[in-house]
């Protein structure tokens, strides 16, 4: 059976007036034309692709001039959706750009597909296994890994992951993956990447309302994003050793679930009083950050869908960036600009570290009632588990990972945003 493709072309001219003032799309005997008359050409292409998909067109051919790498990618970002199959016959590209497009399609689509999976399909161990499979597909000869789960976590003092995940019938998991393309098992670790992998978040006994719980299959978006970033950096030729830690668990309600007032004792000596079981992401990340710090890398990046406060500040349109290292923060913003991905820096100051008071432990897992900068205090909590937190550490609160509903540029579901910027940063720092 022959597949019929709709031809899609680009034009810098306005559409015929019959299509309406400032029309983005027009249709003719030869196919459809996207009219790029505004300043945001990539955004216009992405919005046009959403409109084309919305008309039920699933097979397209990008024809004519103008379909370079970034324009082609913008089209796919808008055209792709979580339901049904779509196919694109791409315009010819130079070999290097064609390879880059192929890598993005493979890796960023993996991120989007993984985040969109239902919690029934994707538990903590399945998330870890999918990450291993992706990295092995990119460069298996450079990959080794260890999966620690269930009671082994408790016995090895991964107190945060075990505490959060023990209330679920599905065992919590820590994936420690070593990407070492140097061939030298004693090579220094250049960077450590830590991801929050909460595969479903009920909020625990600090129970979420349904309207806030219905998207919590995507609470592992940080783990998927940082895994995708490492995979893309590796595919682009990363030559330095990087370790990846995914802290995976379900946050459920049960007779064995953790409770308000519990004290968690971490391997670095910190004690944490739990006063909100829905602030669980920082509790699992702490274990990964302790391991990351022990490697003494030049760079530590953690990614997490950590707070609603960050999303309130920047919406679903940006990832929120926190760091004490001004130069490093600017490097990430430069990488984000180079890849046309949206990051926005939010405040993180030394005084935020003292806004987590507890009567019974060194730290509270949420800020005191007088301190309302929720995203900043969450980042500050994490800093207590990074040995040299003032240099070489970035925290990404992944607000742009997932959309509950479709908008003019995106279908509902995962976006894959952040993968390219973080891969770019890894490569630029590794040079």
From Swiss-Prot:
EC number: 3.4.11.23
Organism superkingdom: Bacteria
InterPro entries for this protein: Leucine_aapep/pepB, M17_PepB-like_N, Pept_M17_PepB, Peptidase_M17_C
Chief localisation class: cytoplasm
Cofactor, how bound (note): Binds 2 manganese ions per subunit.
Cofactor: Mn(2+)
Any one biological process term the GO annotation gives: proteolysis
GO MF assignments: manganese ion binding; metalloaminopeptidase activity
GO cellular component: a single term: cytoplasm
Binding site for Mn(2+) 2: 196, 201, 219, 280
Binding site for Mn(2+) 1: 201, 278, 280
Keywords attached to this entry: Aminopeptidase, Cytoplasm, Hydrolase, Manganese, Metal-binding, Protease
Pfam families listed in its UniProt record: DUF3663, Peptidase_M17
Catalyzed chemical reaction(s): Release of an N-terminal amino acid, Xaa, from a peptide or arylamide. Xaa is preferably Glu or Asp but may be other amino acids, including Leu, Met, His, Cys and Gln
Active site (catalytic residues): 208, 282
Location(s) in or outside the cell: Cytoplasm
Function of the molecule: Probably plays an important role in intracellular peptide degradation.
Family affiliation: Belongs to the peptidase M17 family.
Subunit (UniProt): Homohexamer.
Name recorded for this polypeptide: Peptidase B
Species per Swiss-Prot/TrEMBL record: Serratia proteamaculans (strain 568)
Gene from which the chain derives: pepB
